[in-house]
């Protein structure tokens, strides 16, 4: 038997022994106590879903006023979670502004919920970009957590009853924004 053949045989035997030991150590023994079940996930509430009521919140706007989502029942609402440092967020803002100007007199409201930035930075950005829709400050990211936002921007369209009707993760085009708004405005309350 050659030297290389002997090495391959030893490797094969070692692999079989290790595999057998692993299988033996993980076997189920009748009458042995069961292990504890895995702990429940940390999240205590499910992610907001299309067709379900939107989680309520009250936040400070950059003008100092308080805005409560529940007070906007009867209107079509776009909740847009964003940040000034987020390039995709910045890219969709002009289309959101155009939609706001076009549909606000038809019962459409934008709530631009900024994630964890200070008011001065948000005010400067809104002024620089000439954005006139309400910008809210989610300083502790509580709304972001309630809506289980993992990517910015994230947008939630609500019908007049406060039910989530569409969710978009990432930037939206003008066509998506306006098409969704038109559909929701056309519905009877």
Predicted regions and their residues:
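Short pre-active-site segment immediately N-terminal to redox-active cysteine/selenocysteine motifs
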Residues: 75-77, 81-85, 151, 161
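Conserved hydrophobic/aromatic "anchor" residues
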Residues: 57, 67, 72, 81-85, ...
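N-terminal targeting signals for export/organelle localization
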Residues: 1-53, 180, 189
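A short beta-strand-turn-helix
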Residues: 48-51, 56-77, 103
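Conserved redox-active cysteine motifs that mediate thiol-disulfide chemistry
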Residues: 73, 81-98
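Structural microenvironment flanking redox-active thiols in thiol-disulfide oxidoreductases
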Residues: 90-129, 139-146
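Thiol/disulfide oxidoreductase modules built on the thioredoxin-like
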Residues: 124-132, 137-188
